[in-house]
């Protein structure tokens, strides 16, 4: 396990005032604003690689039984721009310090993390501040214009290309990345992650032929020939340690109303997917009846479309499965993943099916599935016995899972997306939701009169303090005064 030093920028600022006691914090003790990049990077990694639970309600893995959850019923309204005020400001600081110390590697990471955050922001909202963003301190620019979503995506792809170039240079000259809690300082591994993430971004844009100057399909082919994540040992993942502030996010979580979704349980049961045993617990009713963990009939979920009280009744009757306790009883949990080998293989499989690259879609599909089982076998502790290589081979023979060349391209993509979906349990943030918007898969249960949203409305603070730019962006995209969660952004038109 890599030693982790997680120091917030605020703490660094306080420590910098005491250079006589903490002389190694600043390369220049006469400049209190100078902070070694190795002290900034851990916090950036921690924030980017952690995964939350909010999206799991929206993409139908869990239900709430002790209250009404707006994500579960697609009733959210406004998002926030906290990435601008927190994470991206840290990334800007990393760039400043990278330039100060002349580090190629940190510059590469700057471009990667900028791309990562702006990718997520534009998926959430549509048009966002990009070219003029984060310039308040340098240029006193506090009301940045909103760039079109196409321009933002084009910029994200440019940044990832720069990340590849800078990290390749750093690797070639043997530059070690100090403060790297993901890859232990290896620039070549970050290069692989950046390139793999670039493929993910390009596939997100599968409904588009061009994005600014970028030709989506030809660029995908070009990037697919670059260094990529090659096995589970190269996953872009954050491993936790049993230390205050560095433990697994769900450790000791209070889950009084956190239960499995019926649609997810039914899907996994239908194809006899043993990963269900890692995700959920048998119902109390099944346990009392003596059913084994490996008995698929021991699992049940709640209906995500009914009032929470109906699912609460299932809790009282012992007829609904809880989330597996392994997620909250182990302080180190399992690593949380920004992007891993299993997902990358499914990205490549879909690209082959779409005709973007040459290759064997079946091989990529099966390799991705086996990689998922192998990963869980490594980290699922007492549940590892249910996801052996033999279990993966058996699962691959199920009629609803196995690769069949007789299937249509659309049917093949549906199977690929389902495998990406399965590896998203406590790992996906909002990715499976955006995959659904892009492909229609997996299909989500929802009330007939409640359309699935496409985005979040802009923050109130933007409407108040950046009024004209917000109005212009809304009108340009959706029509005047049409900032709605059901307004469709450019990327899926």
Residue ranges of predicted features:
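C-terminal functional modules
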Residues: 373-493
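Bacterial Sec-dependent N-terminal signal peptides
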Residues: 1-30
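Short acidic (Asp/Glu) and glycine-rich catalytic loops that position anionic groups and cofactors
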Residues: 20-23, 325, 391-398
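Structured, solvent-exposed acidic/aromatic patches
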Residues: 61-113, 119-380, 406-413, 419
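Generic alpha-helix initiation/capping and coil-helix boundary signal
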Residues: 3-9, 37, 187, 344, ...
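Membrane-proximal, proline-rich intrinsically disordered regions
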Residues: 19-70, 75-77, 82-85, 89, ...
């Amino acid at each position: 396990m890599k030693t982790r030093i997680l120091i917030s920028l605020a703490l660094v600022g306080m420590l910098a005032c005491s250079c006589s006691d903490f002389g190694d914090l600043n390369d220049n003790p006469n400049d209190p604003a100078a902070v070694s990049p190795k002290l900034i990077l851990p916090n950036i990694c921690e924030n980017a690689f952690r995964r939350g639970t909010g999206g799991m309600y929206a993409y139908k893995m869990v239900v709430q039984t002790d209250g009404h959850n707006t994500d579960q019923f697609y009733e959210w309204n406004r998002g926030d721009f906290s990435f601008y005020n927190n994470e991206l400001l840290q990334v800007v600081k990393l760039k400043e310090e990278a330039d100060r110390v002349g580090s190629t590697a940190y510059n590469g990471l700057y471009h990667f993390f900028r791309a990562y955050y702006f990718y997520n922001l534009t998926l959430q909202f549509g048009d966002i501040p990009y070219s003029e963003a984060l310039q308040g301190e340098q240029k006193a620019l506090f009301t940045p214009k909103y760039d079109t979503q196409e321009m933002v995506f084009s910029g994200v792809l440019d940044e990832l290309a720069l990340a590849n170039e800078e990290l390749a240079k750093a690797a070639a000259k043997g530059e070690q990345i100090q403060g790297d809690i993901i890859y232990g300082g290896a620039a070549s591994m970050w290069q692989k992650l950046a390139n793999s993430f670039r493929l993910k971004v390009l596939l997100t844009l599968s409904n588009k032929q061009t994005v600014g100057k970028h030709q989506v399909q030809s660029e995908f082919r070009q990037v697919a020939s670059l260094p990529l994540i090659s096995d589970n040992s190269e996953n872009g993942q954050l491993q936790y340690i049993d230390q205050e502030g560095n433990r697994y996010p769900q450790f000791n979580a209070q889950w009084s109303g956190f239960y499995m979704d019926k649609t997810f349980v039914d899907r996994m049961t239908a194809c006899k997917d043993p990963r269900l045993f890692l995700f959920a617990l048998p119902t109390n009713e099944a346990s009392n009846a003596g059913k084994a963990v490996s008995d698929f009939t021991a699992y049940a979920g709640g209906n995500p479309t009914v009032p929470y009280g109906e699912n609460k009744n299932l809790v009282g009757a012992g007829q609904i499965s809880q989330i597996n306790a392994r997620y909250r009883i182990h302080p180190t949990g399992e690593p949380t993943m920004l992007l891993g080998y299993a997902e990358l293989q499914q990205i490549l499989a879909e690209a082959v099916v779409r005709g973007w690259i040459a290759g064997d879609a079946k091989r990529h599909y099966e390799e991705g599935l086996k990689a998922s089982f192998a990963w869980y076998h490594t980290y699922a502790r007492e549940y590892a016995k249910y996801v052996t290589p033999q279990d993966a081979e058996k699962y691959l023979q199920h009629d609803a899972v196995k690769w069949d060349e007789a299937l249509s391209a659309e049917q093949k993509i549906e199977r690929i997306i389902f495998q990406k979906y399965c590896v998203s349990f406590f790992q996906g943030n909002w990715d499976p939701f955006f995959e659904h918007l892009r492909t229609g898969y997996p299909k989500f249960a929802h009330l007939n009169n409640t359309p699935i949203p496409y985005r979040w409305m802009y923050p109130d603070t933007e409407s108040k303090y950046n009024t004209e730019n917000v109005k212009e962006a809304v009108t340009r995209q959706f029509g005047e005064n049409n900032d709605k969660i059901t307004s469709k952004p450019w990327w899926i038109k």
